[in-house]
Amino acid sequence: MYQTKRPLLQSKREGILLTIEEEKMTDEQYTQAESFWTRKDETEKKLDADALYSWIDEFLSSHKVLALATATKDFIRCTPLEYSWYNGALWIFTEGGLKFKALKENKHIAAAVFETSASFGGLRSLQIEGTVEPVELFSDEYKNVAEFRKIPMEALKKLKEPMWLLKIIPIEITCLNSDFKKDGFGSRQIWKRCHS
């Protein structure tokens, strides 16, 4: 049963007192909520791995913006960014920002790409877990991605501040697509990178 709100955390950041309150749940309720999808997945029909990856490829190729979450032990950041899906990785050109504070310590990330106009029962989204590799400025890999994005190298070299390039390598992608049900599959499917 839910109890009344109580302060969970108070901290001062930049002179502002922050108070986070929590609806009290029991450990059992947290476990029940946490395991919802894994319990449901046990009985759902799975898509063939190649068919699932094909859907992922098409979905990522047809979208341009993701929400990138980076974190350390005591810092989190979620940033909307433009990306390109190219050669099995997500590529992000970025001027910088606080996401690098977390990336300096922790190269593990989460990202979400989703339909913004989804109706109830018509969801389509990806939750991505992976790692980030900062790409060396003006390396061959950097040049290849700039060419793919049709960004002139001369323009990138003339910038006052560098345009950094992040390479996100997906390790696991959770797909949610209500349309999978029409073909007899579960609406939630999970793709995992095979390690050799």
Annotate each language-model stretch with its function:
Residues 45-65:
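Short, basic/aromatic recognition patches
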Residues 8, 16-17:
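Short, positively charged and aromatic/hydrophobic N-terminal segments
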Residues 11:
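Cationic, low-complexity basic patches in intrinsically disordered or flexible, solvent-exposed regions
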Residues 19-47, 123-196:
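Charged, gly/pro-rich active-site loop segments
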Residues 63-96, 103, 111-115, 124:
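Short beta-strand segments
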Residues 98-101, 181-183:
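Short, surface-exposed beta-strand-loop junctions and turns on beta-sheet-rich folds
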Residues 89-90, 108, 131, 172:
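Structural motif
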